[in-house]
Amino acid sequence: MPAFNRLFPLASLVLIYWVSVCFPVCVEVPSETEAVQGNPMKLRCISCMKREEVEATTVVEWFYRPEGGKDFLIYEYRNGHQEVESPFQGRLQWNGSKDLQDVSITVLNVTLNDSGLYTCNVSREFEFEAHRPFVKTTRLIPLRVTEEAGEDFTSVVSEIMMYILLVFLTLWLLIEMIYCYRKVSKAEEAAQENASDYLAIPSENKENSAVPVEE
């Protein structure tokens, strides 16, 4: 099990790297919505662009709304990332990509008071020869912060399936070993019976059974 846990992430990283190199694509993956107190939490916000839309002016705004409160700005990217004055000041870290398709941020040292609704607004003005269209996308992330990490149902199911697979493989190997052992034993018994039958034949019969050689 530990070996599988070490090899599986490595194989996944190799596969992701190979796909990203051979087939450069953008996938809008939703953000996680649960965090543990004291740990960093990445708020994922991905807004993909088409290949012909690379030239664009992008502005990113992150808002936070506490439970029962109103939205207020906590982070802004406009010609460079900058943190605005807010209760999150000093705990926000830019985690986006150079092409600004991934505009995620990370909240450091998450507290229970960080629970609430996070809004990621991405505004783009594309630079075409004939026109300059403006597009705005919004991602909502309802975050819940807990004191301790809860049991992940997916990981529990995966672990159970892994144990079932190990038991199945063990039984299959045991059956194969028994089958091979019986097969070898039968072959040895047949060889011993043939040898015993040959030794039981009188010497006269052995000489008579020989094929005469013509001169």
From Swiss-Prot:
Q: Superkingdom of the source?
A: Eukaryota
Which segments does the topology annotation call Extracellular?
A: 23-156
Which coarse location class applies to the principal site listed for this UniProt protein? membrane
The UniProt-reported impact of A195T is:
In a colorectal cancer sample; somatic mutation
Instruction: Recite the UniProt keywords alphabetically.
Output: Atrial fibrillation, Brugada syndrome, Cell membrane, Disease variant, Disulfide bond, Glycoprotein, Immunoglobulin domain, Ion channel, Ion transport, Membrane, Signal, Sodium, Sodium channel, Sodium transport, Transmembrane, Transmembrane helix, Transport, Voltage-gated channel
Give the residues annotated as coiled coil.
none
The chain's Cytoplasmic topological domains, given as residue ranges, are: 179-215
Q: Which family does it belong to?
A: Belongs to the sodium channel auxiliary subunit SCN3B (TC 8.A.17) family.
From the record heading the sequence, give the disease linked to this protein: Brugada syndrome 7: A tachyarrhythmia characterized by right bundle branch block and ST segment elevation on an electrocardiogram (ECG). It can cause the ventricles to beat so fast that the blood is prevented from circulating efficiently in the body. When this situation occurs, the individual will faint and may die in a few minutes if the heart is not reset.
Q: What is this protein called?
A: Sodium channel regulatory subunit beta-3
Organism of origin: Homo sapiens (Human)
